[in-house]
Amino acid sequence: MSNIQNDFIAGIGNTPLIKLRAASEITGCNIYGKAEFLNPGGSVKDRAALALIKDAQEKKLISKGGTVVEGTAGNTGIGLGLLGNSLGYKTIIVMNDNQTQEKKDLLRNLGAELRLVTPKPYKDD
């Protein structure tokens, strides 16, 4: 088994390419899709979350026990919640209160603290 990772973080971004047979046949080219849904948090946003955490660590902006705060509609928050909890950070996610209950529950189950806000209309003057 050569595709065994030491931890789930090593799996972020290391998702397989899948040949799209019908598209390949129609075009006469080999066309592949990157299966980003196989990232640990279920989306490409895991990559962004990992990059944000790594950058903050490298710049010494965060250390174990520190807090990560993100305003998000969900997927970046899921990635940050997953990483934050596993790396020893407190994660606070600020999101609209009209997001699905499933998304809110998932974020809480990942160890994130939610701060729900009511969306307001925006007018650019």
Where are each of the predicted segments found?
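PLP-dependent amino-acid enzyme catalytic core
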Residues: 1-125
